[in-house]
């Protein structure tokens, strides 16, 4: 069989939702706002494919740098490198305590 190298390979359990959280997200999750410099957690919502960053960033914490259209720009540390990730608000959760 041929080798498959899709962007969502090996994410069978990583992007799986629990029974209670299935379905589309709330409207408040879609229209949430953030301030520049605010810390956010990147938790991918598998029911929304639009604006979803690469699964390697799932569970990471980053800092809001700016806004691009409906999406937010985040700076995330990946080892020693600082990477800029573009994600929609459905995939972001504000950190409770800075």
From Swiss-Prot:
- Entry keyword annotation includes Ribosomal protein: yes
- Tell me a GO cellular component: ribosome
Instruction: Cite a single Pfam family from the UniProt record.
Output: Ribosomal_L21e
- Species assigned in the record: Methanocorpusculum labreanum (strain ATCC 43576 / DSM 4855 / Z)
Q: Which HAMAP family match?
A: Ribosomal_eL21
One Gene Ontology molecular-function label: structural constituent of ribosome
Q: Which domain of life is it from?
A: Archaea
Which controlled-vocabulary keywords does the entry list?
A: Ribonucleoprotein, Ribosomal protein
- Annotated family: Belongs to the eukaryotic ribosomal protein eL21 family.
Protein name, UniProt field? Large ribosomal subunit protein eL21
UniProt GO BP: translation
Coiled-coil parts of chain:
none
